[in-house]
Every structure is written in C-alpha cells, then in structure tokens.
C-alpha cells in the first residue's frame, strides 16, 4: 500500500514551491523528502567539489563558492537560483551552521555514505502553519520512524516541531551566531583607541604641571619687581670724571711753565714773528737766514727772543716748513748768543 501526499508551499525569497512525497509501504516506512535527496546528490557529486563538497569528517557539507553555487548548480536541481532561499530551506529541515566565517552546514542524519538516514530528517512546522490544538490526528506518543495512521480517509503529515524564537533567530542565513564575531581589525582599532586615550591623559597631566609652574614663575617675577620698586634706592650717577678733570686743570694752572728744547711741533710764520719781537734791553740775537732756490743768503736779521723772561736758544735741527716749497729758513747763532740772561720773575 502506497500513498502520496502533495503539499505545495511558497518558497522563501521567491524560490518556488516544493512537492513533498511521502510513501508508506508495509508498516509505514517513509521516503526522504525530494529536497533532502537532491541536496545529498548535489553535495555527493565529485565533479562539483570545488563549489560544494563534504566536510572534513564527512558529517557536514561546505558551500565554497555561493555565487557559482546559486548560478550554476541550484537551477539544475531546484526551480530557483536563490542561495538565501536554499539556506532557509536547510534551516527548516534542522540544519545548523557550524562556523561563522564560511557556509558549512550539519545535521545529525545527513552524513556521507549514509543516505538511508535522510528519512529521519523532518521539516519543521511553525505554530502558525499547523496549530497544535487544531490537529486531531497528532499522536502524543510519536516515534520518528513511525507515521501515525488512523482508519480515516486522510493520511496526516508528521507532527509539527515548534521552534523557539531563539532558534529562529539563530538559523537565519544572514544573521550571526549567538556569540558575537570578533574581527581582528576591531581589536586593533580598540587597542589604538586605548593607547591614544592614555597618551591624551598623559599630555593633559603634563600640561597641568607646566601651567602651574608658569603661574609660580609669574608670581615670583611680580614679587621681584615689587621689591625692587619699593625697597631699593636708586644710585646717583658718579661725578669722579668731572672731579678728576677739574683737579687736573687746577694742577696745570699751578705748575710753572716749562720749555721743551726738543719740541718738534711746527710753528707757523705768524707765531715765529711774535716770538722774535723783543724789548730793546735784550742782548741776545737770532739770525734768520732764508735760502731760495738759488742758494744765496739775501738777508739775515739779528733778533732777540725771550719767553717769560728766558732767552730761547736755537738749534740747527729746528726747522720750519712754509708753503713755499722752493725756500727754506735756517737759524744761525753767534757765540755771543749762547749766553743766558737771567731775569727776576715778576710776582703775580
């Protein structure tokens, strides 16, 4: 005795409908759902191992390339090419995602080389699709391999398995697992933020210390200025230089005049004439000889010269340069001029 029940339902994400065929033979042995059979064939095909293949322990299968899987393989086995719809159908049959970084699914009855275990996999039913309180044919002592059968004309579907919100949230193909995924970039970013926060706090403390030191130095500077302005008397300028100059001037006035015999200073013609003027009582005489360019003595004058009552001797070394470059003046002294006439200094 065999019976077939056709159940069409809307696929998730526009994936189309699925026909569930259940055959009962003898004592009610079930045949796997076509979705499970097709999925097993798709995974077990060695020609597509680069796209989808069994896992390391042959209890899981991995979709290595979801875009190629949806574009090239799904249309060959199903009526759609939507990978999200395929994942949702896996969730309804109790498949779970193993690792978060790749599409690896597992079911305790989906194993390599054990295709007969597919009969133990049943599709989940939500409470909205088949409410439990409105199912008169549901058996309370249901065993997985047995399908309850009553003497009526309707063959009931396997009892629904109500899923909890936590399971629904976990088995969404786009949702992460219960444990949050930790990305290394996020860890590095968090470490950088922590380091920057520590540096910022250290700089803030250093800035506070520097500001306090600056305020202390400003206060010290103001105190020094106040002390100088209020407690230090200004120092009068020293008059030692003026006192020294006046002292030297007085000393020069008190010293008697001296005669420098070896004075080599140049005496102009007017000063020489003033010195040559002498009173008639003077007995000394000076003869002035002028040599022109013809080297002839034209004139010689005997004159007496005194300075403060003292006769001035003359020497041949003493010479006077006039503006006329062609003539020179010479002093000639007689033997009578070598005598010194002493005179009494006048009282002041």
UniProtKB/Swiss-Prot annotation:
PROSITE patterns: HSF_DOMAIN. Keywords: Cytoplasm, DNA-binding, Nucleus, Phosphoprotein, Stress response, Transcription, Transcription regulation. A motif (Bipartite nuclear localization signal) lies at residues 303-318. The keyword Cell division does not apply. One of its GO terms (biological process) is asymmetric cell division. Belongs to the HSF family. Class B subfamily. This is Heat stress transcription factor B-4.
